[in-house]
């Protein structure tokens, strides 16, 4: 802590000498600001980088004429000789031209500082705004967009739930602009579908164990970076309207939506506001049957709003305030008819009959879905401590309300709801040092303070998961050393300290398997629980040759098991008797990136171990969820290839993801068993081809293929019938084709048409299969459906 006290004192008392400054903005040839440009005066060993608005300031420059270098991957380097006089500020506007010989790279900021993608020793997928716009022509469901674009992410469940949509077989943390949306204290696993794709400028997916943002990142994290108030005029905007329908059967299947955004710059103020409304109709499978409505996407109303306001206090200071809401509520006219299955023999031959919906209603059931609210206040101060350091701090508030479907697993039935509130404060420093021309050292360090209040009850007032009140604080430091523009070395530490207070409560009678076997109510005395964890990461990447950019890395992540699931089925008399500790995940990774003029290849292999397993496991002997005590070993690989030809008029690409996992009892490493489908996804293959015959027309064909996964043998239950255990049902693969076309009516007006499941494939999403023993989730996927939309920019 002494380090931070000293840093804070320096921050409050820093001063500068009476010397010159260089201030400016950097733009591309279209006049758009460029983020992350290196500005360096080698003779003075001074440097900085441009901010999100392309602005920069370099202070304490002595009198004289010096060469200033402006460089960034994907742009031609510019060198200007500038004369400085004492006590003077030189202002410039610098334009950089794209380098046709180099592939432009996205700057990644999810790791708390801007970094080049090819210089990070880790596996990262960035879904840029163009990809989001193109794929949004087909769907507004972000789960399906990420399913196609992110190798290593399991396929979508076809619902608004992401239970089973793991990242490399591990749980993931979902964030919006760095603010956590997941509810790890009682993980409802609805976090991925938490924002409108229209409001996203890019998605950053960091894979492998990570603790850079704390609890929950065993498999990595997804960070939605929302659009910023960057504009050249007082008012600019985008209008998007669309209609969609199932084509297999059209009865009440029509849906529609509208989105409007406005942005602008007025003096020192920048603003961005948006709102959208969407309604979906009935959903039918390839045979024209109503899709199972549980967690469904049918008959859903979605409201979204986003607002950001920035004020430039000075050349180096900026304050911004923002917030967003996302309400997605399903009010379906259908009730579920649950699926069923029969296993015939010890070989595992089976018949699986999926569930579906029939007209009807459940008395008292409220609409299901999510209500999310975010608010944040940010302060930026650049070029302090002799121009070497940028300081950022943000205060945020996040509220989640997840409303689940009616279930007869509760005594007398009921509908549960997760309520979570988070309050956070995060001061962060980024320091860049250039001891010589061949060495650049970057340090990121700061504090995370978090208050999280979570519970889960029933809408009728019964409490299922007691009030959990957590306060955590963490300190971290991440270092990067760049040597001779050839090597990037990275290492970091994060220490977390968590303290939880849990109220006294009584467990609810509950039947986890829905078989009428209700656990009795237990009175549990509340108390306090404490956890701490020190996580380490290190990596190295060789960046000299674009044709082969290899890396190797090691990282750790940690999470508290889904504490709410444990508490609601507790057998102990006191929470202090529950043996619970963080699950620590260690991730080993090797990969490389190869880039040629028109060709890009990325491949990675990984091995991940967790000494306690992750999450919770179902114990059939006591009919309850318990903390997982079995170590898990997960391994896999990913490959992605992209190629462009004919002046980028033809674009083709493919990716393949494979993951497998094993577990064993503590002390019995030789008796290995496979992990279930809720953890390990079946292999995934994607491919696309995009053709742009003219400047006005583009068309794409995309394929998603899910492979088979059949790792488990059936067993005889108490009635001498063959069956499969929880999450161990075989998965049978399928292939989906989606087509879309975009046509520019004018430079600022375009229309698009998309057809999903082009061949009307009858299929069951992976979760509908491996979770078949639960019956609740076994539904079919949607048949052929279409979306027609129009986009207008002004």
List the model feature ranges, each with a label.
Residues 314, 440-444, 448-450, 463-610, ...:
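Structural signature of Gram-negative outer-membrane beta-barrels, strongest in the C-terminal barrel
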Residues 251-280, 285, 289-333, 435, ...:
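Transmembrane beta-barrel wall of Gram-negative outer-membrane proteins
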Residues 197-238, 793:
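A beta-strand signature from Gram-negative outer-membrane beta-barrel systems
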Residues 143-183:
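Extracytoplasmic beta-strand/coil segments of soluble accessory domains associated
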Residues 280-282, 296-302, 316-378, 382-384, ...:
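Flexible loop and strand-edge segments within Gram-negative outer membrane beta-barrel domains
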Residues 4, 558, 646, 652, ...:
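C-terminal beta-signal and adjacent terminal beta-strands/loops
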Residues 59, 144, 179-207, 260:
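Short acidic/polar hinge/loop motifs at secondary-structure boundaries
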Residues 240, 450, 485, 598-600, ...:
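Gram-negative outer-membrane beta-barrel transporters
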